[in-house]
């Protein structure tokens, strides 16, 4: 599709012999670049201003390049859609692969969580058993200390009684020996 050329021309003349001229030409084609040339200038009436030393014309020219959007055809659009569909399918495969991995990791985490829960219960049970055993050991230790105290007391009592008993036995023997000696 091609646009028609547009041409604008503006001219104004002042009362003192000064004129301002602008011309603009624009050509636009939808599939190509457009170049716009603008020419501006001052025209001075020579008769009135020649004595002042002005030149006839002071031109100013500028060029502007405009980039137009290219035309898209049905075939080009269909090609882009097919390319996007292929990219989407690749991304879908990659997503499903990652989802499968995440699912496997999730399953592993759930199993490990269950194992941790079981181990936590067993550790708590062992802690309770250990606490119970420590209490029993403390009880046995206190009984052992009490028995040692009682044994020490009994041993001392027995020694004291043995000593008296030994002295009594010795006295009885001494009396008996003395009695026998007196009989002879």
Curated annotation (Swiss-Prot):
Record bears the keyword Protein transport: yes
Any single Pfam family the record assigns to this protein: Nsp1_C
Molecular function as annotated in GO: structural constituent of nuclear pore
Coiled-coil residue windows: 117-151
GO biological process, one term: protein transport
GO CC, any one term: nuclear pore
Entry keyword set: Coiled coil, Protein transport, Transport
Top-level taxon in the UniProt lineage: Eukaryota
Family (UniProt): Belongs to the nucleoporin NSP1/NUP62 family.
Protein's name in the database: Nucleoporin-62 C-terminal-like protein
Native source species: Homo sapiens (Human)
């Amino acid at each position: 599709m091609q646009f028609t050329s547009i041409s604008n021309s503006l001219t104004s003349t002042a009362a003192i012999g000064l004129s301002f001229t602008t011309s603009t030409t624009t050509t636009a084609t939808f599939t190509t670049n457009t170049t716009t040339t603008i020419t501006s200038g001052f025209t001075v009436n020579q008769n009135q201003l020649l004595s002042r030393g002005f030149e006839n014309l002071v031109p100013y020219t500028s060029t502007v390049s405009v980039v137009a959007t290219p035309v898209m055809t049905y075939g080009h659009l269909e090609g882009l859609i097919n390319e996007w569909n292929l990219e989407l399918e690749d991304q879908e495969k990659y997503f499903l692969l990652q989802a499968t991995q995440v699912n496997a990791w999730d399953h592993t985490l759930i199993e490990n969580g269950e194992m941790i829960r079981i181990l936590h219960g067993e550790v708590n049970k062992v802690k309770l058993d250990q606490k119970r055993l420590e209490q029993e050991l403390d009880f046995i230790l206190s009984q052992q200390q009490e028995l040692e105290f009682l044994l020490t007391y009994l041993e001392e009592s027995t020694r004291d009684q043995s000593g008296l008993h030994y002295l009594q036995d010795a006295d009885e023997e001494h009396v008996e020996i003395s009695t026998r000696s007196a009989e002879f």
